[in-house]
């Protein structure tokens, strides 16, 4: 069900200032004419001059043509925003599933005063009207014509090149929009005088359906949308006062995984200079699939919407041609049915290891990469797994305390860690059970939250940080531990996935929100850390050496900081015991038991063949016996 369309609100029309002729009596009264006339002309001239200066600030010429932006207010002063800038041709009709094409030049002036359409996607209807889910749902009309980006820049425009932050939204590669209120760039830009860019990219089947080897649906076109936006930044951000030689890419969840994939893809690597990965990593178990699984999901979707199955050859063209005839909402309605099994924190269409954008698996590329001199900021929130439990884990709901039974915990491990052997699942249960209180519902709830969070976010991020640091990168790490006073999710969920973003973007500074005074100060601190990192590659405050220092993360010391209302606290070992289990022990267990699993499969296959043979023999014997009895009559 698509969200209701919201009325687009454009800028107020400026009143034309009409120059009035002074009254004749003033012109003929020497004692009054000069002062009053000068005052009148000064007031009128000042108004016209101010409007002229504003027009100059809001008119920008980029390679494609001219843009008119809008002036936005913040408590600290105005910023200029250029919203809904087209950077690619609409990927509709015959362009569906294909790589993006740069936007052709236009004539006239593009109205860049309001956000444009959101890319077609699944809309969360699990808890209708609930702020915790609605804040992530599309807030503009859904369309395949959605490849637009936004630029916020200080007002007045910087006279010297200013560092640029480029945001990539999350949403499991199946949802997301740059126009969400939580991504409003005005507060960060005004407070830190950076330039901020965000872009839409295709999600779900439109961005990540893949028939490897096919030119018609090569896969990863959502990542290519992001890359094209980064190329646009290199070509055009100077017109907004931005510095194309100082671009920091930052994202959260699937956006963070995307940032990591651009780090691992040589054609993208030269388009930015620093990276921030919030609650996501390219090596997460949900972030990519292999070519075989990508093809299976694509053909399964085709089957579900009534398109003929594709093969490895020419049939792919017919399959894609059929998929292009299906309404966008029909594809969205069937996306979730292609997953191989019931699970949480798994998504239908995601980046594929295609040998092109990703020449190998993220793990292999991380292990083999040269990251000397790279500057990276990574982190997680305190309770990464809790958000996902209400989307399918047995016994969980936002509307109660989710005090689960032992049986629900065991079933939850199977959906939280899908596609592993029974032995591996049992190892997870053994590691996460509090054996002093193995039946305690609250402890079981927390344990399953940790299973999902550690497996999918915390330990992939820790692994990435350690590998990058060991290979010469300068890495900073954090755990975000503040639960917002405005959070609508229940207390048992703690600090859920995604709820640091509002502080990074300075949303507490919005006077229409009900954050505390301490949270406003906290948001200013976080914006300063992120902006410092964008400026220098170091989040620490260079102007205040007495301030608490945020040390680099190294493979040996593993130092990170806790981010909450208190001053920085330095800690060591990001979930070290749990991550040793996921990153060291479990892979060895799976490798060691691989042959056992294969032997079990072979034994079951032989047993099935033997059982089928015995059934067939019995049927033949019964048939013979009946014939023999009939011949005796």
Give the positions of each predicted feature.
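Surface-exposed patches in mature extracellular/periplasmic domains of secreted proteins
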Residues: 307-320, 334-336, 440-441, 477, ...
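Non-catalytic accessory segments of hydrolases
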Residues: 2-12, 18-223, 244, 345, ...
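Short, solvent-exposed turn/loop segments enriched in Gly/Ser/Thr/Pro and often Arg
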Residues: 202-205, 250-256, 479-487, 545-554
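C-terminal transmembrane bundle
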Residues: 498-500, 560-563
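Ordered, helix-dominated protein-protein interaction surfaces in large eukaryotic regulatory proteins
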Residues: 3, 22, 71, 89, ...
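Serine-hydrolase-like catalytic core of hydrolytic proteins
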Residues: 28-46, 130-316, 325, 359-391, ...
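Substrate-gating cap/lid region and adjacent catalytic-acid/histidine neighborhood
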Residues: 283, 322-520, 529, 536, ...
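Alpha-helical packing segments of well-folded alpha/beta enzyme cores
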Residues: 145-148, 229, 460, 526, ...
């Amino acid at each position: 069900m698509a969200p209701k369309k919201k009325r687009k609100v454009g800028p107020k029309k400026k009143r034309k200032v009409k120059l009035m002729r002074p009254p004749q009596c003033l012109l003929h009264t020497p004692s009054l004419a000069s002062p009053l006339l000068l005052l009148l002309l000064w007031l009128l001239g000042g108004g016209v001059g101010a409007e002229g200066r504003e027009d100059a600030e809001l008119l920008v010429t980029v390679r494609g043509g001219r843009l008119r932006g809008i002036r936005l207010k913040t408590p600290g002063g105005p910023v200029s925003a250029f919203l809904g800038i087209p950077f690619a041709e609409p990927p509709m009709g015959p362009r569906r599933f294909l790589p993006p094409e740069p936007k052709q030049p236009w004539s006239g002036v593009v109205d860049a005063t309001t956000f444009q359409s959101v890319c077609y996607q699944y809309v969360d209807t699990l808890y209708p009207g609930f702020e915790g889910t609605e804040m992530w749902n599309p807030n503009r009309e859904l369309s395949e014509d959605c490849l637009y980006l936004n630029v916020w820049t200080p007002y007045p425009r910087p006279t010297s090149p200013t560092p640029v932050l480029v945001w990539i939204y999350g949403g499991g590669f199946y949802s997301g929009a740059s126009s969400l209120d939580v991504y409003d760039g005005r507060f960060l830009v005004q407070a830190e005088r950076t330039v901020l860019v965000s872009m839409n990219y295709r999600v779900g089947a439109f961005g990540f359906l893949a028939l490897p080897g096919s030119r018609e649906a090569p896969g990863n076109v959502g990542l290519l949308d992001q890359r094209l936006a980064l190329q646009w930044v290199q070509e055009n951000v100077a017109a907004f006062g931005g510095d194309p030689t100082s671009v920091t890419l930052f994202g959260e969840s699937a956006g963070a995984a995307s940032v990591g994939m651009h780090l691992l893809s040589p054609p993208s690597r030269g388009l930015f200079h620093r990276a921030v990965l919030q609650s996501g990593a390219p090596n997460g178990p949900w972030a990519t699939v292999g070519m075989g699984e990508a093809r299976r999901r694509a053909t399964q979707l085709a089957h579900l919407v009534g398109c003929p199955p594709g093969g490895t050859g020419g049939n792919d063209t017919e399959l894609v041609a059929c998929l292009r005839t299906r309404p966008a909402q029909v594809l969205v309605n069937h996306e979730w049915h292609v997953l191989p099994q019931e699970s949480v924190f798994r998504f239908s269409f995601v980046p594929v290891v295609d040998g092109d954008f990703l020449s190998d698996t993220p793990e292999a590329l991380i292990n083999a990469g040269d990251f000397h001199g790279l500057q990276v900021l990574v982190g997680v929130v305190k309770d990464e797994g809790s958000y996902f439990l209400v989307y399918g884990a047995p016994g969980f709901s936002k509307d109660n305390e989710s005090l689960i039974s032992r049986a629900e915990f065991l079933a939850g491990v199977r959906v939280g860690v899908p596609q592993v052997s029974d032995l591996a699942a049992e190892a997870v249960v053994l590691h996460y059970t509090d054996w002093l209180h193995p039946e305690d519902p609250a402890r079981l709830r927390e344990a399953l939250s940790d299973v999902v969070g550690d497996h999918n976010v915390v330990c992939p991020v820790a692994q990435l940080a350690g590998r990058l640091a060991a290979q010469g990168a300068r890495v900073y790490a954090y755990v975000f531990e503040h639960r917002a006073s405005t959070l609508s999710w229940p207390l048992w969920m703690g600090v859920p996935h995604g709820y640091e973003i509002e502080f990074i973007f300075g949303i507490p500074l919005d006077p229409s929100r009900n954050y505390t005074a301490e949270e406003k100060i906290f948001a200013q601190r976080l914006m300063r850390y992120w902006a410092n990192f964008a400026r220098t590659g170091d989040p620490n405050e260079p102007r205040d050496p007495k301030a608490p220092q945020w040390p680099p993360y190294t493979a040996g010391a593993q130092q990170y900081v806790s981010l909450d209302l208190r001053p920085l606290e330095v800690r060591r070992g990001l979930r070290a015991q749990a991550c040793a289990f996921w990153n060291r022990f479990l892979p060895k267990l799976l490798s060691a038991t691989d042959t056992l699993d294969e032997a079990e499969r072979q034994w079951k296959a032989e047993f099935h063949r033997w059982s089928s043979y015995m059934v067939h023999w019995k049927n033949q014997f019964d048939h013979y016996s009946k014939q023999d009895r009939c011949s005796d009559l």
